[in-house]
């Protein structure tokens, strides 16, 4: 079988990457070792930047029609009782969006299947061979391979790529359960996470309503100790923790799905090994707190997709594909850093010093500037990396066709040159990869060039700088443009 891109892993990262590639008409095949999709809810909500990214492709609204019931409250840092306020970041989604990971995966896979993309399940990878011209995985030949196969990446192991970092010091469980009986302490609606996290009888735990009679239980021992990661999770283990935290009146009904997690923290030194690129948990792992793992993986895919497509479609500038690593590696490193800090602060039972540290952080988070700083990191709205421009705010526009907004103009996954000052600008040499729109807006800006991933590549009025930015990010023009800046 011949294709252009082989994606290994049908989680959110792999599915999002495949979607980006198919928008650019790049042949892609997705391989997944699990025969059926994992039904466990896992991450229970999407961070604001993930919501923005999905909105940039028109993928969010169908999910918003089926969100989980929750109060409109901000995110959290280490479970501290202060809401993270994302409104200063000018986002349409200032609160985490209640969409379980399983539902997101189902939605993305449905989109791929409707576009004719093969998602081949029950295909565990046992052989990866690459040469100067491409990659062979079993009987499939492609130009590149994207390893999106999780923290225990088979591709990474086969290639012998080191995964430096530290082992976990915490052993915890997340489970989708039903309740036979419930006490008054069991929540009926999602609130701020600080109101859900509880400690009792040597355990910490949180119980979040999903839908119907289904709940998401997370628990572990305050000591951090627990069974090995591969140890089976028994009903007795779940029942003991549930009763310890939520009282003897709360009876376990059924354990639907369950898995263990830890605070292990690792990151690849380089996200590329020849013609193999790593994304999502295959490139970095950390304590799964605040939905940052899904956030990172989706944005990895969003950054990589258009660059990989440009490369195989023949218009990528030199070293464009290498900017995937230089832009995404420092962002993930920052997440690993903040989750290590959270792993300490989230556990108040460790010692008095940690309690004092928690109190100090609570005071800091009540300061607007400190809250904005932390909320930008956790939400993914504040992204900083060498050469990476800021995200384009989803502003209201008026075009000749009527009112619209930036995100609605980017569903096709192409670049966008937006002229807001009434001047005519030309992208004729790049018209096969960049859309040109004239509009009016309340924004005080002449014009802006937006990359397919929603980051600003250029803004202002300087025509020569615009042409340089077009060449830098979108390659050489098919025809040399006339100077109509």
Segments from the language model and where they lie:
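Short, flexible hinge/linker loops that cap or flank conserved catalytic cores
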Residues: 1, 270-271, 409-411, 441
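Core Rossmann-like FAD-binding/catalytic domain of the broad FAD-dependent monooxygenase superfamily
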Residues: 1-358, 362-369, 481-485
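Short, surface-exposed beta-strand/loop micro-motifs that present aromatic residues
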Residues: 204-208, 404-409, 446-447
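C-terminal helical "tail/cap" subdomain of flavin- and related membrane-associated enzymes
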Residues: 309-399, 406-415, 420-429, 444-445, ...
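Thiol-based oxidoreductase modules, predominantly thioredoxin-like and allied folds used
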Residues: 433-440
